[in-house]
From Swiss-Prot:
Its main location: plastid. This is Photosystem II reaction center protein Z. The chain crosses the membrane at residues 8-28, 41-61. One of its GO terms (biological process) is photosystem II stabilization. PSII is composed of 1 copy each of membrane proteins PsbA, PsbB, PsbC, PsbD, PsbE, PsbF, PsbH, PsbI, PsbJ, PsbK, PsbL, PsbM, PsbT, PsbY, PsbZ, Psb30/Ycf12, at least 3 peripheral proteins of the oxygen-evolving complex and a large number of cofactors. It forms dimeric complexes. May control the interaction of photosystem II (PSII) cores with the light-harvesting antenna, regulates electron flow through the 2 photosystem reaction centers. PSII is a light-driven water plastoquinone oxidoreductase, using light energy to abstract electrons from H(2)O, generating a proton gradient subsequently used for ATP formation. It comes from Marchantia polymorpha (Common liverwort). The gene is psbZ. Keywords: Chloroplast, Membrane, Photosynthesis, Photosystem II, Plastid, Reaction center, Thylakoid, Transmembrane, Transmembrane helix.
Amino acid sequence: MTIAFQLAVFALIAISFLLVIGVPVVLASPEGWSSNKNVVFSGASLWIGLVFLVGILNSFIS
């Protein structure tokens, strides 16, 4: 269970880093939002899911 928690936290940190870098780049590029909005929404959905997963796994670890 600890390994799953650590992997979920690592994935959350990695996705957060990618979103912090990627979203401003997409918004600043011409035609970027209209062509990449599905990718941004998928990344945000994955991030929200990982936040809940880390919270649930944390309740089992603590």
